[in-house]
């Protein structure tokens, strides 16, 4: 058994069946003591690493063997951790507990944060022109320069967005124009392939029957229009087309 070898083969009243339990005392056998040291040292270093990773703790471990050999581990810096320890001890004058040290640290941090909040609030009030009565001419010039630089950046960003929107609308206009041309070409081709469609009210000749566009001084009124066919004999026809003339006239 390994534990027997560590104890030099001596039986112990603390030894149990299965995994044994040894008495914690100095191992007299040099070889067994060195083997035990290596095993326990590795386990201690592993535990220190796990503690630093799992608990986000600052850990520093220093071990000297019986032969004077140094073994150390630190997740940050052994020297830095020692300096922090010395500072904590000196600040507390060797009388404070860990809880008191932590409380003092958090009080200092909260005081710094409160000071930063007050400084930011004062700066915002100055930018809004609320607390400029007690400012010197130099401070006012500095504040004016800050505001001008801020306005310049804001206008630059605004113009950038406007130009981007204009560019998008222009591209959109070109796309719509191209789509319109394609649709017109398809309609014309469809009418050429199907001449009967042009005779329908929805055909291209239907546009020729519509009156010319009106100016603003002469609004459109459907009662001012009538068909020429109403003024001509019912039997009048074109000899070539064989249909009535439907040219629209406007009463003035």
Curated annotation (Swiss-Prot):
Gene Ontology CC terms: nucleus
Expression (tissue specificity): Detected early in the floral meristem but mostly expressed in stamen and carpel primordia.
Example GO biological process: flower development
Domain MADS-box: 19-73
SUPFAM superfamilies noted in UniProt: SRF-like
Induction (UniProt): Negatively regulated by the A class floral homeotic protein APETALA2 and by other repressors like LEUNIG, SEUSS, SAP or CURLY LEAF. Positively regulated by both LEAFY and APETALA1. Repressed by silencing mediated by polycomb group (PcG) protein complex containing EMF1 and EMF2. Up-regulated by HUA2.
Effect of disrupting the coding gene: Mutations result in the replacement of the six stamens by six petals and of the carpels by a new mutant flower.
InterPro entries: MADS-box/MEF2_TF (IPR050142), MEF2-like_N (IPR033896), TF_Kbox (IPR002487), TF_MADSbox (IPR002100), TF_MADSbox_sf (IPR036879)
Annotated localization: Nucleus
Chain segments annotated as coiled-coil in the UniProt record: 99-166
GO terms of molecular function: DNA-binding transcription factor activity, RNA polymerase II-specific; protein dimerization activity; RNA polymerase II cis-regulatory region sequence-specific DNA binding
Keywords, sorted A to Z: Activator, Coiled coil, Developmental protein, Differentiation, DNA-binding, Flowering, Nucleus, Transcription, Transcription regulation
Pfam family, one: K-box
Boundaries of every K-box domain copy: 103-193
Region (Disordered) location: 1-20
Assembly information from the UniProt record: Homodimer, capable of binding to CArG-box sequences. Forms a heterodimer via the K-box domain with either SEPALATTA1/AGL2, SEPALATTA2/AGL4, SEPALLATA3/AGL9 or AGL6. Heterodimerization also seen with some other Agamous-like MADS-box proteins. Interacts with AGL15 and AGL16. Component of a complex made of FLOR1, VSP1 and AGAMOUS (AG). Binds directly with FLR1.
Function: Probable transcription factor involved in the control of organ identity during the early development of flowers. Is required for normal development of stamens and carpels in the wild-type flower. Plays a role in maintaining the determinacy of the floral meristem. Acts as C class cadastral protein by repressing the A class floral homeotic genes like APETALA1. Forms a heterodimer via the K-box domain with either SEPALATTA1/AGL2, SEPALATTA2/AGL4, SEPALLATA3/AGL9 or AGL6 that could be involved in genes regulation during floral meristem development.
Protein name as annotated: Floral homeotic protein AGAMOUS
Species name: Arabidopsis thaliana (Mouse-ear cress)
Gene: AG
